[in-house]
């Protein structure tokens, strides 16, 4: 029999890896179902009580004043809040949720969304779109989950779920600042696949996941990516998370071309002050004539102070280094600082969140910079190394529950 080529051998190892994962999942599910059946036959359960469902929605709109006054009204290289000098609805969504609990083991999420922030966040600049991506982008977390009665409780989840990578959410209402940091826009906000989470004890929780790729709306190839997260909570005020994502993000799927991303988050929450530190590093060898090894790093240090029940203040310094331009599209180092003043107006199940925010971004590198009001050459918008933004945002939220 002829020897396998390097590429074929790599694919064989990849698929053998995922076959083993699939067999393990089937065995786990079989064990779970058998355990449930035995428990039901030996210990008949009382009539279950009504389950709690959560529903709501939000509307997020803002005006970002860019003092560079770019002719195209764009925040260069960004996937969220990328339109400036105009009023925009950046996100609007409605949702329905039910948590998986011991009394009602099946859970679900359904989220419908629209707005500027749903246009490009899950796509890739270097890979084709997933079939159906134009309507899939209107789905936020949309999944089913099951809490299996194994040990302390194994939670299985499948569908579109919130990413295990990163400190910041796609939805500004869930963040301390209105605009997201650079590292958030170049890592997944959502994932499409399956995951299994298990609490080993009150301090350690482990999660394994298999997803369709780095970006959930991209179709770089037919090989899934996989990863894990370990979460450690030594006290009620401190959390440490380490997450690894590994898989191919280009047409060439040999193992040497797989992308590796490591994300580390340390958060400390006190009564009024929350401090977090995030560092991620990614690397990937690009299949091209020279096969360059690309590298990028990101770090942020947000500090949030709840001045009162309604007022809060946040400052967030950050730095993003894209040595080869693999993620941002340009070889550059970006240093930024964001300062946010927030005021909340609660009313029954609704609330209004008002934010006034300033951010300054400085990009250095042969191809770095931000759009301005000049022209570098006919048909090409000029670039400035520094950008100042002043944002005013209004986020209206509604959240309630019913029992069924």
Model-based region annotation:
Residues 63-71, 116-122, 164-168, 214-218, ...:
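Gram-negative outer-membrane beta-barrel proteins
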Residues 202-205, 223, 228-337, 343:
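Detector for outer-membrane/organellar transmembrane beta-barrel domains
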Residues 341, 345, 384-404:
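Outer-membrane beta-barrel "beta-signal"
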Residues 347-383, 404:
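C-terminal beta-signal and adjacent terminal beta-strands/loops
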């Amino acid at each position: 029999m002829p020897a396998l080529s390097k590429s074929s051998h790599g694919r064989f190892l990849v698929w053998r890896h995922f076959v083993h994962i699939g067999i393990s999942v089937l065995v786990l599910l079989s064990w779970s179902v058998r355990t449930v059946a035995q428990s039901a036959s030996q210990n008949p359960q009382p009539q279950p009580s009504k389950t709690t469902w959560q529903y709501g929605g939000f509307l997020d709109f803002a005006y970002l004043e860019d003092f560079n006054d770019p002719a195209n009204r764009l925040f260069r290289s960004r996937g969220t809040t990328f339109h400036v000098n105009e009023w925009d609805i950046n996100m609007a969504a409605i949702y329905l949720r039910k948590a998986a609990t011991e009394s009602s083991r099946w859970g679900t999420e359904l989220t419908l969304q629209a707005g500027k922030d749903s246009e490009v966040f899950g796509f890739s600049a270097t890979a084709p779109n997933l079939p159906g991506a134009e309507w899939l982008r209107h789905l936020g977390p949309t999944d089913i989950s099951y809490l299996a009665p194994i040990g302390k409780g194994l939670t299985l989840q499948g569908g579109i779920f919130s990413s295990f990578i990163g400190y910041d959410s796609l939805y500004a209402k869930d963040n301390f600042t209105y605009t997201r940091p650079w590292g958030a826009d170049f890592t997944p906000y959502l994932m499409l696949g399956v995951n299994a989470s298990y609490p080993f004890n009150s301090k350690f929780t482990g999660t394994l996941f298999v997803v369709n790729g780095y970006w959930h709306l991209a179709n770089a190839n037919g090989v899934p990516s996989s990863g894990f997260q370990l979460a450690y909570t030594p006290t009620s005020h401190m959390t440490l998370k380490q997450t690894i994502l590994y898989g191919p993000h280009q047409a060439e799927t040999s193992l040497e071309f797989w992308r590796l991303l490591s994300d580390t988050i340390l958060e400390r929450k006190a009564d009024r002050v929350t401090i977090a530190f995030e560092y991620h590093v990614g690397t990937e060898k690009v299949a091209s004539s020279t096969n360059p090894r690309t590298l990028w790093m990101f770090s942020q240090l947000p500090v949030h102070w709840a001045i009162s029940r309604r007022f809060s203040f946040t400052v967030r310094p950050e730095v993003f280094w894209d040595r080869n331009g693999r993620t941002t599209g340009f070889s550059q180092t970006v240093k930024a600082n964001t300062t946010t003043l927030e005021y909340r107006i609660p009313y029954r199940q609704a609330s209004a969140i008002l934010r006034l925010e300033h951010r300054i971004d400085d990009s250095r590198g042969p191809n770095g910079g931000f759009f301005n009001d000049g022209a570098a050459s006919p048909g090409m918008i000029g670039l400035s190394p520094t950008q100042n933004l002043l944002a005013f945002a209004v986020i209206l939220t509604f959240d309630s529950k019913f029992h069924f």
